Amino acid sequence: MNIYAVRLITFSPTHTSKQVGEAIVRGTGISDVARTDLTFHPAGKLEIPESTLTVITVPVYGGKVAPLALERMKDVHASSAPAVLVAVYGNRAYEKALVELDAFASDRGFKVIAGATFVGEHSYSTQQNPIENIKDVVWLKRCLDLKKAV
């Protein structure tokens, strides 16, 4: 399988899932990058070819993938495109969110090749009262480590 492009699909109300996804995409070294941001709008009908690595990043709420993220991705399908799945969680556990995202992506034709979880900024965080408990430098290193594993 030859990979010629990367597509980042993200749902990121606090921008944290998007930041993690962007770091993973940069780590691939692939310059042909398409982005689908589901934060404000659904993806619509989208077919991902086998030659495109897809990075899907979503936040976790209450141990599950944010329901709105799944709703906005429902018309995204793949022809055995490889996928890296990322669940970003805040002050709680991610529980089975990655398993849930794996089932969702697999049902839509993705070939899941990797999954990761990252601790990120909690949705209750504010500039005056940040409750982010991981720094960008650590994220970037983990994103690059994920690239090596893939």
Indicate where each model-derived feature is located:
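FMN-binding flavodoxin-like domain, especially the glycine-rich phosphate-binding loop
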Residues: 1-7, 12-150
